[in-house]
């Protein structure tokens, strides 16, 4: 899989120059390229490349913000997805003093890419005013704008600027999410679930309040609530498990937990297997956890879901899973004793140690 930063390549730069010149014939290509400084391009991250383009546009477009914004609004429809986040980034960097024009531009840009990161400084500047705007966007006809209402207000948006006030008190976000609880777009519903999951990490009582009000009212809301509870479910929260019908696992026996190999080299995979038996009909959520050794020798547990299923009285089910120990950009592996645990309905049923070397 190609590195995401390669989206910002020479072809994109050429296309950007072409489309900007179509709207602004006086655009100085040479000055733009000089300020872009492509000689160190390979070393730059995705965000650094995007920001370099944003700054170079600022140095080359008209200094009047509204005039430059008009050119960018003409250009933006030609750039979809991550390639288009440079346009909201321009607003984020240079548009805070031009609230009305910037908000209209972000509404437009998000329909081709996403303005979720660019709205964060506006929340920091005037949270009450921006929350009101996000609430208005929650009723927009375009699903990308409705998603922006939720995604932009997430207390813990990945890659996004932190909003300390919403981390401390996320309740202002709830009216926005309530507008979207039955949204017809899965794209929007995923964002709502992610927002509520963010909230649950520090304010689980607020998620419970939403669940009490909405769970069981519509298939869309049930889907949102279930996905919003994923962190609490992984933590084995008893109230969360009970909400979805997972009772205690006293009647479940787990047998023959084994893993191969017992000594695993970084880059290889661990295979483990076990079987379960139930003394009664029951709904089960089966997970496994690995206590990974970290860089300084401390351990950090990560929980992975295996399945959610029903098991009948006197039924036996077997499971085999493979866990890769190949280094990823999101996880680096270290040598040492690791622990594998199997969890059923929030209860650890068995564990074993293995060596990573």
Swiss-Prot record:
Descriptive protein name: Uncharacterized protein YhaZ
Signal peptide (residue range): none
Gene3D superfamilies: ARM repeat domains (1.25.40.290)
Database matches in InterPro entries: ARM-type_fold, DNA_alkylation, HEAT_type_2
Induction remark: By mitomycin C and UV irradiation which requires RecA.
Superkingdom of the source species: Bacteria
Record-annotated disulphide pairs: none
UniProt HEAT repeat ranges: 173-211
Pfam families in UniProt: DNA_alkylation (PF08713)
């Amino acid at each position: 899989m190609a590195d995401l930063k390669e989206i910002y390549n020479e072809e994109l730069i050429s296309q950007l120059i072409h489309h900007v010149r179509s709207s602004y014939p006086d655009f100085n290509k040479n000055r733009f390229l000089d300020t872009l400084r492509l000689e160190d391009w390979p070393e730059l991250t995705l965000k650094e490349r995007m920001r370099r383009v944003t700054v170079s546009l600022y140095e080359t477009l008209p200094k009047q913000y509204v005039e430059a914004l008009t050119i960018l609004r003409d250009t933006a429809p030609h750039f979809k997805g991550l390639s288009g986040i440079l346009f909201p980034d321009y607003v984020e960097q240079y548009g805070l003093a031009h609230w009305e024009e910037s908000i209209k531009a972000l509404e437009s840009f998000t329909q081709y890419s996403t303005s979720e990161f660019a709205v964060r400084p506006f929340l920091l500047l005037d949270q009450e005013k921006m929350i009101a705007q996000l609430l208005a966007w929650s009723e927009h006809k375009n699903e990308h704008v409705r998603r922006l209402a939720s995604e932009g207000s997430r207390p813990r948006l990945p890659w996004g600027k932190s909003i300390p006030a919403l981390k401390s008190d996320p309740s202002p976000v709830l009216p926005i999410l309530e507008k979207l609880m039955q949204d017809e777009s899965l794209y929007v519903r995923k964002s709502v679930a992610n927002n509520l999951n963010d909230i649950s990490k520090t304010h689980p009582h607020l998620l419970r309040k939403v669940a009490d009000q909405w769970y069981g009212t519509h298939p869309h809301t049930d889907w949102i609530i279930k996905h919003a509870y994923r962190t609490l479910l992984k933590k084995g929260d008893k109230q969360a498990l009970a909400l979805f019908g997972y009772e205690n696992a006293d009647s479940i026996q787990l047998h023959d937990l084994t893993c191969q190999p017992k000594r695993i080299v970084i880059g290889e995979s661990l295979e483990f297997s076990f079987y379960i038996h139930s003394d009664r009909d029951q709904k089960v959520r089966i997970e496994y956890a690995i206590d990974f050794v970290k860089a300084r020798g401390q351990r950090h547990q990560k929980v992975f879901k295996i399945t959610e299923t029903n098991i009948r009285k006197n039924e036996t089910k077997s499971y085999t899973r493979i866990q890769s120990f190949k280094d990823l950009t999101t996880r680096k592996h270290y040598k040492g004793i690791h622990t594998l645990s199997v969890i059923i309905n929030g209860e650890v049923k068995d564990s074993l140690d293995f060596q990573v070397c």
